[in-house]
Amino acid sequence: MSFRGAGLRARNVSAAVLIVFLVISTAALPGCLRRGSEGKDQVVDKFESEPTISLYINETGEKRQIKMEEYIAGVVAAEMLPDWPRNAYAAQAILARTFTLAKMSEGGMRNEYGTDMSTSKDETQAYDPDSITDVIREAVTATRGMILAHAGRYVKGWFHASSGGETTLARDGLAYEGAEPAYTKRAAVPAELRHIPDDELYWSASYSLAEVRSLISAQGFSLGAVNRVSIIQKDPTGRATKVRIEHAGGHTDISGAAFRSALGADRVRSALITGLNSTSAGIEMTGRGFGHGVGMSQWGAYGMAQEGSSPEEIVTYFFRDVDVQKLWD
């Protein structure tokens, strides 16, 4: 399973790390994307005009037609904090638009609701039209029709709240099971560290051993009474990629991403665990960052925008060999 990553605002609503992909209407559109059946990266085609998408309102059961750019504004408002610089919002808009268009061939929520997407953050993408500001509208307008592509195909526009200073690859941050995408990379993010508040950057969490057993067992792992927890493998950025749980029945090794998800992604904010003390009483952890660490760091985008980077410079910084393309005027 591949995850997008809880945004700065959306993460406060859901503790889960979500897979976040959207689709636009399957009605025939001039210049629409080629539609496949396997959900793989799609070839980029231009549109003659801005698409309209269908949206299922989970709260009311209503189905609504909405222009793409209006929808993107609601997504950006839901995924980022208020009062941020315009170019940070604009970078987020490019990724949100890329996600939406990349899923045109995958059916969206048509099997469930007969629509392209829903307002459920667990099913698609965070959406909050009531929080759209003038600055967000300006950012969406400034990037109208823009998406991020690699070799003529849409990228998986992963993002996360904070990288802790360096982003990582999908196989490490997400335990991504497919081939590593050619456009992911590890990138130092000094602009993030220059601007992020300490309470956003650093975190700590503690659990009793009984809690560890209960939470990890709930994910389908068979554990005896837990005796010790340790990190046995890290990636080059320092993120835990394999965690060992020693218990009465032996030991169980799980990925760092699975460990974080099991214990709660709102408490274990990232796999960039800088300290883990395991005793008979429980475990205490410290770490940096928030989210899986793959793709664009939102606090990195904030810092880069504050220091004068354009939206295009921001999004291309976090991915390898990509370019921004404009698909409609």
Question: Each PLM stretch: what is its role?
Answer:
Residues 1-329:
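Conserved, single-site charged/polar hotspot
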